[in-house]
């Protein structure tokens, strides 16, 4: 385990030990600390995975995977098919329970104790490769539903929106390049625009961590560039984990200095700048090719 992972793990362990002492002394309950709505980012770590292993019928999809994502960081995850990228995100979002290991959001939320809806409420949102929007509704209505996600579809559409809510939707529309398309039916948007709309719907939920699975798959070159611009504006306010195969897009996001993680056979094969991992002989052999 690398020194930065050891440091992150030590901080989280210390936080949990403090909570245990408080609970035994009659203070705040340990369960409440782990399941609280607000993640504690005091130590600067947004997401911490330690020795996560997952097996399916004898196949190890994740093999003692350890990873730490800092608050406000954008991390690109690359690797060959079957490397464990999707399973990793399934564990983070509660879709898959690991055989062993630890997964924490901030220093106080144990993700392995939460169900999928609780993880979303804690501030983790996931975007799949294929966009999922309400195609029969307008772009604005899609964002309205996302903003009022505690209501049903019908109730949300007929509820009166406040001024701040309308302003928030306008901000998101501007951010995701869809302001001119606000009242267009979502089903008429291009593939890239649907991707932007879904990202906007996630942003309406005010996530602290965004998990993005091949977000530019099927996009034009222009849409890919504008998506990179969008993600770069989110850095700092949100933490982002971007799973991607498009090395040109990864280069746009990392800008020569952000860290890239390479997965292989369920564990971390290499980490560093894009240039560093591209020159790594192991990465070349198993993923990039010679």
Report the location of each language-model feature.
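Conserved ABC ATPase "signature" region
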Residues: 31, 36-40, 156-181, 229-232
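Catalytic Walker B motif of ABC-type/P-loop ATPase nucleotide-binding domains
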Residues: 210-214
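Helix-to-loop junction immediately C-terminal to a conserved catalytic motif
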Residues: 93
């Amino acid at each position: 385990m690398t020194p930065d992972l050891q440091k992150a793990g030590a901080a989280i362990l210390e936080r949990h030990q403090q909570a245990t002492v408080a609970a035994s002394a009659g203070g705040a309950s340990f369960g409440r600390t782990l399941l609280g709505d607000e993640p504690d980012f005091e130590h600067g770590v947004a997401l911490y995975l330690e020795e996560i292993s997952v097996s399916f019928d004898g196949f190890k999809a994740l093999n003692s995977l350890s990873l730490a994502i800092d608050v406000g960081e954008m991390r690109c995850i690359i690797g060959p098919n079957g490397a464990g990228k999707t399973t990793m995100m399934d564990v983070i979002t509660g879709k898959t329970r690991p055989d062993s290991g630890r997964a924490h959001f901030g220093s106080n939320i144990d993700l392995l104790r939460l169900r999928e809806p609780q993880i979303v409420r804690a501030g983790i949102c996931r975007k799949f490769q294929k966009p999922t929007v309400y195609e029969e509704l307008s772009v604005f209505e899609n964002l309205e539903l996302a903003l009022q996600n505690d209501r049903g579809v019908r109730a949300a559409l007929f509820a009166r929106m406040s001024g701040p809510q309308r302003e928030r939707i306008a901000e998101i529309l501007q951010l995701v390049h869809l302001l001119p398309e606000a009242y267009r039916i979502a089903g008429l948007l291009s593939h890239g625009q649907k991707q932007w709309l879904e990202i906007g719907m996630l942003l309406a939920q005010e996530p602290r961590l965004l998990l993005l699975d091949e977000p530019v798959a099927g996009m034009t070159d222009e849409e890919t560039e504008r998506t990179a611009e969008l993600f770069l504006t989110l850095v700092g306010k949100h933490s982002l984990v971007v799973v991607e195969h498009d090395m040109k897009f990864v280069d746009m996001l990392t800008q020569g200095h952000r860290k890239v993680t390479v997965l292989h056979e369920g564990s971390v094969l290499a980490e560093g700048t894009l240039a560093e991992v591209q020159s790594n002989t192991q990465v070349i052999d198993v993923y990039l090719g010679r």
